[in-house]
Regions:
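Glycine-rich beta-to-alpha active-site loop
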Residues: 59, 75-121
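STAS-typified acidic loop motif
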Residues: 7-33
Length: 132
């Protein structure tokens, strides 16, 4: 039977753009507490067949990256939703980790896709001029 009232396929979209973590005076980075409610809302839409996530991040805080990644996977499993990730200009380090929460990842051939990196700090003591 023909019907003009077809079921619409709904795919909520989440846009994550910026450095991961509380960055700068006005905390303009991407952090879990700032995204938690938005992510939860996207996955709670019952008619949604999937959740789309656009990521544009060079990385940043590994803790925030893991929190966001794990929360996306947890809600995807709980709500039985597919996650489709679109890497925009850059998805590197922690941005790439969040991308790995997707069941599918799409990127432009010009996008910068990086590895999940590591940052290490060291203390270096240099001799003073008198000791040289």
């Amino acid at each position: 039977m023909f019907s003009i009232f077809k079921k619409k396929k709904i795919v909520p979209h989440i846009k994550l753009s910026g450095v991961l973590g509380n960055v700068g005076k006005f905390k303009q980075g991407i952090d879990f507490s700032g995204q938690e409610e938005l992510i939860k809302k996207a996955f709670s839409i019952k008619k949604a067949i999937a959740v789309a996530i656009s990521i544009n991040s060079p990385g940043g805080s590994p803790v925030q990256s893991h929190l966001i990644h794990d929360y996306i996977r947890q809600l995807a499993k709980k709500n039985k939703k597919k996650v489709i990730v679109f890497a925009e200009d850059v998805a590197a380090s922690g941005g790439y980790l969040i991308s790995c929460a997707g069941d599918e990842i799409y990127a432009n051939s010009s996008s910068i896709i990086g590895s999940i990196g590591a940052v290490s700090y060291t203390h270096l003591t240099l001799p003073t001029n008198r000791e040289v």
